[in-house]
């Protein structure tokens, strides 16, 4: 057998051409200290701020938080008990991402997007970076569509628009979460996807909340992101950004989303803990100097996009817990200055039975007024004035023995309107129902009823409208306005039912 040297050369050449030498270069470091959810590593010379790293021996993920001259401070996103000194850390060359999309609806997840509800793995088709730049002014348009909370007092006096940031602030146990949950329940059938982020709460409280959402059929369009009090500070720190990324997915798809951060006080405390452990210099109330930026970069991501960019929206309802009514503390003042208004809840009102316990004088919505439907604008305009005058006169009336008839009439009207502002939890009202009830209140139809009978009248009147005047409600809902014809029809309906109510139940 004769071997042809030319053939051998060809075979060798083809083999050499197809040969690729793969050098797997990885920037690695060694753990020099670990504890309290923090690790310090020597090496990782080219690691970038907020880049993901992996502890090779355990597979645990971390994030490069502090870049110092001779070491890197890493926050550990998960269990740190098994990580020991001398373990290897490698760069992952990416920043943190979470799964997003409709696969997450109806699920309870941790800030890394891992399921906590025992319903199996999440089949997410897309991932989004947790930290992204907020859309610029060019990409936005003014807030012009209402986000109905279903709560009369808020929709009439402190209206929220899609794309707005409205702070809910108050002491513990004043009904802050209740407002947020009612808002989620009220989005049923309105095409708004909801993300509820629980930061530093008891796991049992979150479980009860998820159960309530299931009872009202609200989990179908809601994702719950949980970093409970038992979780590391690092997971509590990342949770709101992860929830925001999940909401942004819908916004950039041209849809409407609502994200609730409950609450950012605990978020700031978690960030303070991480910063102090990493020896960053403390400032006021021991918070680091960039705690304002911590919340501003999160809340600026809420926006109403211009139609050219899909016209989607992301509405943010951050919650802040105050200590002893002190809204002039560091974190409350920061978040008040970032948001487009606040709903201030007061313990004294709450314990007096005025629920939702909103202080109308200190609460404001800076952009939502433009988004109110015309029908609501017509009834809410004089409502604000009536209540403001009533609150002014109420204090004065306590000292005065004799009041002139005009003052007495204003106080009478105010008392009935305040009673009308009360609302049960988990019972949001449609906008046309709110308009009908408030119209009766501001036009004096309730002035001669006992204050105790106002809520009974409201309940029965709404039932009467649904059964006998459904066409009227439908027209208000569809036209979003209260023209002369509809107003006359509504007035007649109120008068008819009132005479019936007085006959049956008295004044």
From Swiss-Prot:
It is found in: Cell inner membrane. Pfam families: ATP-synt_ab (PF00006), ATP-synt_ab_C (PF00306), ATP-synt_ab_N (PF02874). Its EC number is 7.1.2.2. The keyword Calcium does not apply. Keywords: ATP synthesis, ATP-binding, Cell inner membrane, Cell membrane, CF(1), Hydrogen ion transport, Ion transport, Membrane, Nucleotide-binding, Translocase, Transport. Produces ATP from ADP in the presence of a proton gradient across the membrane. The alpha chain is a regulatory subunit. F-type ATPases have 2 components, CF(1) - the catalytic core - and CF(0) - the membrane proton channel. CF(1) has five subunits: alpha(3), beta(3), gamma(1), delta(1), epsilon(1). CF(0) has three main subunits: a(1), b(2) and c(9-12). The alpha and beta chains form an alternating ring which encloses part of the gamma chain. CF(1) is attached to CF(0) by a central stalk formed by the gamma and epsilon chains, while a peripheral stalk is formed by the delta and b chains. This is ATP synthase subunit alpha. It comes from Thermosipho melanesiensis (strain DSM 12029 / CIP 104789 / BI429). The gene is atpA.
